């Protein structure tokens, strides 16, 4: 039994999480976990795991997503990084995530509590406060 799953950051690593999902499913381990923790792209895939997206669904969806939204870095924002909270346009990412959430829950604004009540899985998202340089 797996109690915790941790998915880390790195856009290219995100593609490998489809393989992780396949392996967990094949070995009947996906229903047993209690907590899933993600950071950056890992947080998006953690959400998709909790929403019960299958590897086959993700293999069909991912090629349709303009993955440049995860690599579309405006390097002129480096100086503004602490106030803009990132180098990518978060609004483009939010649009994609909203569609994926709504497809499974019918509610793009679902709360963590509602998601837990629906799935019995704890979704934990980790990020760093750039002003205080600590995890939040």
State the predicted function of each range.
Residues 1-2, 114:
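Short, Lys/Arg-enriched, disordered terminal segments
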Residues 2-104, 135-136:
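Patatin-like phospholipase
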Residues 23-25, 109-112, 124:
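A generic local structural motif
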Residues 100, 104-119:
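Short, structural beta-strand-to-alpha-helix junction motif
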Residues 118-136:
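Active-site gating loop/helix substructures
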């Amino acid at each position: 039994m797996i109690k915790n799953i941790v998915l880390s950051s790195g856009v290219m690593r995100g593609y490998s999480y489809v393989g992780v999902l396949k392996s967990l499913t094949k070995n009947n381990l996906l229903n047993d976990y209690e907590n899933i923790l993600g950071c950056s792209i890992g947080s998006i895939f953690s959400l998709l795991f909790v929403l019960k997206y299958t590897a086959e669904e993700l293999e069909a969806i991912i090629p349709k997503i303009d993955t440049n939204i995860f690599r579309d870095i405006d390097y002129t924002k480096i100086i503004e990084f602490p106030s803009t909270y990132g180098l990518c346009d978060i609004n483009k990412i939010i649009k994609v995530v909203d569609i994926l959430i709504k497809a499974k829950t019918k509610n793009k604004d679902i709360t963590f509590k509602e998601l837990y009540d629906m799935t019995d899985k704890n979704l934990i998202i980790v990020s760093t406060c750039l002003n205080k340089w600590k995890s939040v």
